Amino acid sequence: MDKIKLGVLVGGTSIEREVSKKSCENLLANLDENKYDITVYHLPADGNTEWAKNIISNPPQIVLSALHGGNGENGSIQGFLHCLNIPYIGSKVLSSAICMNKAMAKTVMKANHIQVPDHVFVMRGVDFSQYEESIKLMVFPLIVKPNRGGSSIGVIVARNMEDIHYGIKNIMETYDDDVLIEKFIDGKEINCCVLQGENGPEAMAVLDVKKAGSVFVYDDKYHIDEYSSDITSLPDFMQDMIKSIAVKTFNV
C-alpha cells in the first residue's frame, strides 16, 4: 500500500512561532512513518515564501498544519491551500478567520444564543474615553487579552484601571492592534473537542484542565511537566450540556 504524502507546516511569522515548533515535534513523534510520506515545510520568521514554491511544485496529498497564531490560523494559510486544491485538516477559511478574531467569534455566538462573557472591545486609534465608562460598569477583576492572539500570550488579570491601561498599552505595543477586556470567571477550565465524522460532528470526552493558578497561562499549556488533563468527574447531565454547547458552537 502506497504511503500518503503528508505535508506538515511549521514556524511562521507569528509570535507563537516557538509554540508551533513544539506542536510539530509532538506531531512527528506520533505520526506513523509506515503510513505517511512526511514532508515538513518550514515557514521562516522573516516571511520568505520559498516554502510555498515547494508546495506548489510538489504538492502533498493532504496538509496538517502545526502553525499557531497569525496567518497560520486566521484563514490565510487555509485560503492558500484551498486555492491550490490541496486538502487540509482543520477548520476552513471562514471559520478560521472568525475564530481567530475573538470579538467577531463572540458576536457570532451571541447571535446564535450561545452564552459568552461580557466584554469591551478596544480598537487602536479610538480615544480610550469612549470605552472608559463601559469598562467602569464591569466588576473587577477583568481579563485583558489580545483580540487575535493565542497561547495566553499577553493576557493579564486586571484588578483596577491602572492594570487596564497597562494591559492595553502592552498588547498594542507588542501583540495586536485590538484588545478584548472580559469579565473574569474563576472556575473550572474545561476542554471538549469536536470532530467532524461521517455521521456529523461528535463531541469527544470532557476534560478537566489542571492549571497552576486561577488563569490558564502559557506555562500551563506548553510546559509538559506542569500541564495535565483528565476525564472530568462532573455529573453526566453537566457533561451532556457541555457536549451539546460544544457541538452547537462547532455547527455555528
Residue ranges of predicted features:
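ATP-dependent carboxylate activation and anion-phosphoryl transfer catalytic cores
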Residues: 2-4, 113, 235-252
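Glycine-enriched alpha-helix->loop->beta-strand junction motifs that scaffold or abut catalytic
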Residues: 85-87, 114, 199-200
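Generic secondary-structure signature for well-ordered alpha-helical cores
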Residues: 33, 114, 173-177, 211, ...
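ATP-binding N-terminal substructure of ATP-dependent carboxylate-amine bond-forming enzymes
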Residues: 1-94, 98-100, 104, 123-132
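Solvent-exposed alpha-helix faces
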Residues: 25-26, 169, 247
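Phosphate-binding site of ATP-dependent enzymes
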Residues: 159-244
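Active-site nucleotide/adenylate-binding loops and adjacent lid/helix of ATP-dependent enzymes
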Residues: 2-9, 38, 55, 98-182, ...
